[in-house]
Amino acid sequence: MLEQMGIAAKQASYKLAQLSSREKNRVLEKIADELEAQSEIILNANAQDVADARANGLGEAMLDRLALTPARLKGIADDVRQVCNLADPVGQVIDGSVLDSGLRLERRRVPLGVIGVIYEARPNVTVDVASLCLKTGNAVILRGGKETCRTNAATVAVIQDALKSCGLPAGAVQAIDNPDRALVSEMLRMDKYIDMLIPRGGAGLHKLCREQSTIPVITGGIGVCHIYVDESVEIAEALKVIVNAKTQRPSTCNTVETLLVNKNIADSFLPALSKQMAESGVTLHADAAALAQLQTGPAKVVAVKAEEYDDEFLSLDLNVKIVSDLDDAIAHIREHGTEHSDAILTRDMRNAQRFVNEVDSSAVYVNASTRFTDGGQFGLGAEVAVSTQKLHARGPMGLEALTTYKWIGIGDYTIRA
């Protein structure tokens, strides 16, 4: 099955690579229209997925990611239309020169070819990834979480109908709808057809891909994000940022999971934090130093377990640790962070600059929420993933991250001397 999918995707990629920006946008507009026109089919399939997932004990955070509503589906269709408005990087001349030989040399952006994406139970990812791949002239093979099998099958069928109505092969967007995990291992060895693999999921999936894949892999999406509260912070303003970073949408990878508090401000900061977290329904997981002060406050508080510093809660839970100074905070982030998103709250710009320079994450913030790490917020449009590695992309992966480049030399029967 996967062999045939690979062949179809590779053949489709050749045709997609030749499309103009106008032709690609026409396809995307058709997809957006069809998602709305056939919304009942997709929503019915999703309702079955959600019912099964709930019966199987899936947590509320994951159920929230899985569920579609008419409003959410319309938002997904609107996101596809937004991709139409983004500048197409394909064909862009990055740089060029004329060599001493007279050869005109240029470096031009081109599609990668076929992208493979393994991702969690999030139906919007199916459409986001497909639209970005099509915009950049790439074919894509999708393998979503088993909880979304019906939703993904219905959504991809709608996308394929739109492709065919525009004269393009259905192989441009395909989904593996068999939940058999053995197919993931098979997919990891499809280097004959897939040019880049993006796993979005937990540490176990990332480890599997790194160890077994014969395809270049870009990992990301695991966000053990930190906020360091410096001693010079403005407490009221800091609390606004922390509430946003923790509670706006706890199930996302850019949500803060650990709060590091400078010991010199702990006495005044922790009571205010407890009050705010109680109002927000957040459970605090505190180290010994913080626990002594937080136990008298209104927020629910428990003693932190050592392993929780490495946890991505994806829920209304927040680690709180007292640190000696900026050096201590940076050391903690280096040991427990996932190089996703980390922030400092401070009025001391020297400390801010040190934090920016010394914290080696894909996104580092000064006096701002970690929730900004998002393709839409960065002006990139929908994102394929948030890469936490350094090659070939880092941070939110928009259109440019789905391209590579080729060198083109134009001569006049020019030969090398």
UniProtKB/Swiss-Prot annotation:
Keywords: Amino-acid biosynthesis, Cytoplasm, NADP, Oxidoreductase, Proline biosynthesis. CDD domains: ALDH_F18-19_ProA-GPR (cd07079). Pathway: Amino-acid biosynthesis; L-proline biosynthesis; L-glutamate 5-semialdehyde from L-glutamate: step 2/2. It catalyses: L-glutamate 5-semialdehyde + phosphate + NADP(+) = L-glutamyl 5-phosphate + NADPH + H(+). GO terms for cellular component: cytoplasm. Its EC number is 1.2.1.41. GO terms for molecular function: glutamate-5-semialdehyde dehydrogenase activity; NADP binding. GO terms for biological process: L-proline biosynthetic process. The keyword Cytoplasm applies. Gene3D superfamilies: Aldehyde Dehydrogenase, Chain A, domain 1, Aldehyde Dehydrogenase, Chain A, domain 2. It comes from the Bacteria. Catalyzes the NADPH-dependent reduction of L-glutamate 5-phosphate into L-glutamate 5-semialdehyde and phosphate. The product spontaneously undergoes cyclization to form 1-pyrroline-5-carboxylate. HAMAP family: ProA (MF_00412). Belongs to the gamma-glutamyl phosphate reductase family. NCBIfam families: PRK00197.1 (NF001221), proA (TIGR00407). This is Gamma-glutamyl phosphate reductase. It comes from Escherichia coli (strain 55989 / EAEC).
